[in-house]
């Protein structure tokens, strides 16, 4: 099952330490990260930053911006340590570079939870054809 999870996430191009990121999203939202967020809107998934469609899509935009600031990290291969304590994500990583990655993933998971009211099922699988490029800075 774990192998299937990893393959599914890699196929849709989610950035971040995929196992940890997926767990965080599931813990914060109760939603399956692959089916709910991996191809959502114009910013969730492998393409570059585009003009966000709504607050949920903006979460992915900000996540990409957060990852852009990381140095010497491989968001697909690197993993970090975190825990779920009292319904909160706690980044426990001692390596500063990996702790930053954890904080980026924590922020997007919390952002998804806080913006569940903006989630539009019609954007769940967006082909990105009509997404507009943005000059909006990170």
From Swiss-Prot:
- CDD domains in UniProt: PLA2c
Site for Important residue of the cationic membrane-docking site (MDoS), residues: 121, 124
Disulfide connectivity? Answer: 42-131, 44-60, 59-111, 65-138, 66-104, 91-102
The keyword Phosphoprotein appears for this protein: no
A Gene Ontology molecular function term for this protein is: calcium ion binding
Family to which this protein belongs:
Belongs to the phospholipase A2 family. Group II subfamily. K49 sub-subfamily.
Q: What is this protein called?
A: Basic phospholipase A2 homolog Tbo-K49
Native species of this protein? Answer: Craspedocephalus borneensis (Borneo pit viper)
């Amino acid at each position: 099952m774990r192998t299937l999870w990893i393959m599914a996430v890699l196929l849709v191009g989610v950035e971040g330490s995929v196992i940890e990121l997926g767990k965080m999203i599931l813990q914060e939202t109760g939603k399956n990260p692959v089916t709910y967020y991996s191809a959502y809107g114009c910013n969730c998934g492998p393409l570059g930053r585009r003009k966000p469609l709504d607050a949920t899509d903006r979460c992915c935009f900000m996540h990409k911006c957060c990852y852009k600031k990381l140095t010497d990290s491989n968001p697909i291969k690197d993993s970090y340590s975190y825990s779920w304590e009292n319904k909160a994500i706690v980044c426990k990583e001692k390596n500063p570079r990996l702790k930053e990655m954890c904080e980026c993933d924590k922020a997007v998971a919390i952002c998804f939870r806080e913006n569940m009211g903006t989630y539009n099922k019609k954007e769940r699988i967006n082909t990105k054809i009509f997404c507009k490029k943005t000059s909006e800075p990170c």
